[in-house]
Each structure stands twice: as structure tokens, then as C-alpha cells.
Regions:
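Substrate/ligand-engaging "lid" and interaction regions
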Residues: 1-208
Length: 208
């Protein structure tokens, strides 16, 4: 659709990985490199397949926006997308122009973003409050990996979502909902402030 302006991702940092710790291409990714854009099985393969469909139908612009809590997250999306495009083009499974399309900032962008909103383990007080409102089935439990989970999420009130304002097909007015749009350099500075200067160090000190 020409009106589609952005696709957002929250798949964790590992979700963008193409290789294992030894640098070997993951089995599912390697298989999709050979299959091409017609029937990929991996999540990333399906995403790039949709981009290829967009390329074939007018080379329409779009922003691929990672909202995962990892440094320079847009670069991780870009690396995954271009790797798939290159693999398919090299094998003759996609038109050669596709590799250039996903690298053209006027066609496909990969904005950086920084998100900060602490979501601690489920709180018994919140469970009790929701129960008082008539909501049932909220019992928390511990998984086999010792993760404390529940059907509800509680979070701090303070929240920030800062996104690089690079949207080649325009964007929704998300600033009306509190999203901060700025340039890439400022996104990087805000992230460093969070991780190295203000927020995370203070939280660590308070925890100790």
C-alpha cells in the first residue's frame, strides 16, 4: 500500500541475529538464503520478502523502525535486511535492483530509537488491585528458566521513546502520544545519558 509509512519491530536484540556466536550462519537463515523471497520460514526472511514485494510493486518508500532496547538498533535491522537482499540477488532469486533499493535512504530507512520504561517483575499489589476490579486468572508463576511472569504487566510512570526522524514516506503524528522525534546524533546522546550517565547508574546504585 502506498499509504504504509513504517513497520516497527520489538523482537529483542537476538531477533536480528543471522549468525551464531562462532560466526556461522544460523540454519534457518541459511535455508532462507537459498529459498529466496517466495517462501521464507524465518521471521527476518518474511520481513525482507515483504520488502521485496513492495519493491516489485512500485519501489515504494518505508521506514523500518526497531523499538528494541539495544544500541543503534536501526543498524541491526539494516544489516539483516541487506544481508538477505544480497544473498537473494547473488543467487538470482531477486532482481538485482532490490539490493540497491534497501540501501537507498530515500526508499528504505532504518531509524535509530531509544526506549526507556522500566517494567519490573509482576507486583502482588497490582495483582490485588486488578482482582478488586473483578479481573481473575492473574496468578503469577515461575518458569523453568526461573523467570517470574504473570498475565499482567506493571511499569513505572516515567517513559521515553526517542526516534530518529527519518521517514521517507512520511510518518504518523506519534509526537501527539509523547514520542520524541529528533536527529540520529541526539538519539545516540540520549541513549548514552540513559546507559552511562543518569538513569541506569542511579538505578544500579539504588539497588545496591
Amino acid at each position: 500500500s502506498p499509504s504504509l509509512q513504517m513497520a516497527s519491530f520489538t523482537i529483542t536484540e537476538k531477533g536480528y541475529a543471522l549468525t551464531d556466536p562462532k560466526g556461522n550462519t544460523l540454519t534457518a537463515i541459511a535455508a532462507d538464503f537459498e529459498k529466496g523471497p517466495q517462501k521464507p520460514d524465518s521471521y527476518l526472511g518474511k520481513v525482507v520478502s515483504l520488502l521485496y514485494h513492495r519493491y516489485l510493486n512500485g519501489k515504494l518508500p518505508i521506514a523500518m523502525v526497531s523499538m528494541d532496547n539495544c544500541s543503534h538498533n536501526g543498524d541491526k535491522v539494516a544489516a539483516a535486511v541487506t544481508a538477505f537482499a544480497d544473498a537473494w540477488c547473488e543467487r538470482g532469486l531477486a532482481e538485482t535492483g532490490f539490493a540497491a533499493y534497501v540501501r537507498d535512504p530515500k526508499a528504505v530507512s532504518y531509524p535509530w530509537s531509544m526506549i526507556d520504561k522500566i517494567t519490573p517483575r509482576p507486583d502482588a499489589k497490582v495483582e490485588k488491585m486488578l482482582g478488586a476490579d473483578g479481573i481473575s486468572g492473574l496468578d503469577a508463576y515461575v518458569t523453568s528458566k526461573h523467570t517470574y511472569v504473570a498475565p499482567f504487566v506493571n511499569a513505572e510512570e516515567c517513559e521515553y521513546l526517542v526516534i530518529e526522524d527519518h521517514f521517507p514516506n512520511g510518518r504518523p503524528a506519534l509526537e501527539k502520544g509523547g514520542v520524541i522525534f529528533t536527529d540520529r546524533e541526539t538519539v545516540d546522546k540520549v541513549e548514552k545519558m540513559k546507559v552511562c550517565t543518569c538513569l541506569n547508574p542511579l538505578h544500579t546504585a539504588l539497588a545496591i
